Amino acid sequence: MKLIILEHYSQASEWAAKYIRNRIIQFNPGPDKYFTLGLPTGSTPLGCYQKLIEYYKNGDLSFQYVKTFNMDEYVGLPRDHPESYHSFMWNNFFKHIDIHPENTHILDGNAADLQAECDAFEEKIQAAGGIELFVGGIGPDGHIAFNEPGSSLVSRTRVKTLAMDTILANARFFDGDLAKVPTMALTVGVGTVMDAKEVMILITGAHKAFALYKAIEEGVNHMWTVSAFQQHPRTVFVCDEDATLELKVKTVKYFKGLMLVHNKLVDPLYSIKEKEIQKSQSAKKPYSD
């Protein structure tokens, strides 16, 4: 397990974006080899998405051979509703990059058979070869996707009733009107995310500090679903200073002492422009008789 500690939200977002960029480029995706990326919604990943868009616009990164799978979607909210996760992903990420729409996968909260929709989502992930890198965020209570306190740590994609705390927290997106807030959602399970080859969790802000403490310094507990990722062989937690406020000083010092090593994951920062130059140079073989 790696814990990446940066001073500010913007730095944490940039580190995460650089990591995604390097992972995609090093994977060397192509028509017969897609990079599969799990993605979250919410305010936490916005900074990361903005940097990824910047990399694409600068010609350093392409999503042409990337398939994405989103974590969750509300039940009963029209797809074009401004607060649907379809709208969120399109407006904040997908429409700004070169990803093909058919390679983006988001659960349909208006499907006639919701559980069949969840089962089909799991099948699509398997058909794509599994998730190479699943990026997630958490709530103050440590929930990932809509796997709220008490969720099974081996759960799969399913229909979930939302906790009142989540409904209250989401009311700000619906004009403060609780009657407008969806009470159910479709969500990947903890087990679904655990099946990914690698997991990166973004945790920023003092209001997430206790959840990070539970994830790092205490044991695995279904009341704090983020703690399950202690048992994943390749977990990267990326946080800002504010999110570490509940951690022991020696814990923070220990992981900061590893930053020289961990920063090698994003330095050097790879670019598809450089790869194209290398390809063209290798294609120009010197004359020999």
Swiss-Prot record:
Catalyzes the reversible conversion of alpha-D-glucosamine 6-phosphate (GlcN-6P) into beta-D-fructose 6-phosphate (Fru-6P) and ammonium ion, a regulatory reaction step in de novo uridine diphosphate-N-acetyl-alpha-D-glucosamine (UDP-GlcNAc) biosynthesis via hexosamine pathway. Deamination is coupled to aldo-keto isomerization mediating the metabolic flux from UDP-GlcNAc toward Fru-6P. At high ammonium level can drive amination and isomerization of Fru-6P toward hexosamines and UDP-GlcNAc synthesis. Belongs to the glucosamine/galactosamine-6-phosphate isomerase family. The gene is Gnpda1. This is Glucosamine-6-phosphate deaminase 1. GO terms for molecular function: glucosamine-6-phosphate deaminase activity; isomerase activity. NCBIfam families: nagB. One of its GO terms (biological process) is glucosamine metabolic process. Homohexamer. Its EC number is 3.5.99.6. Pfam families: Glucosamine_iso.
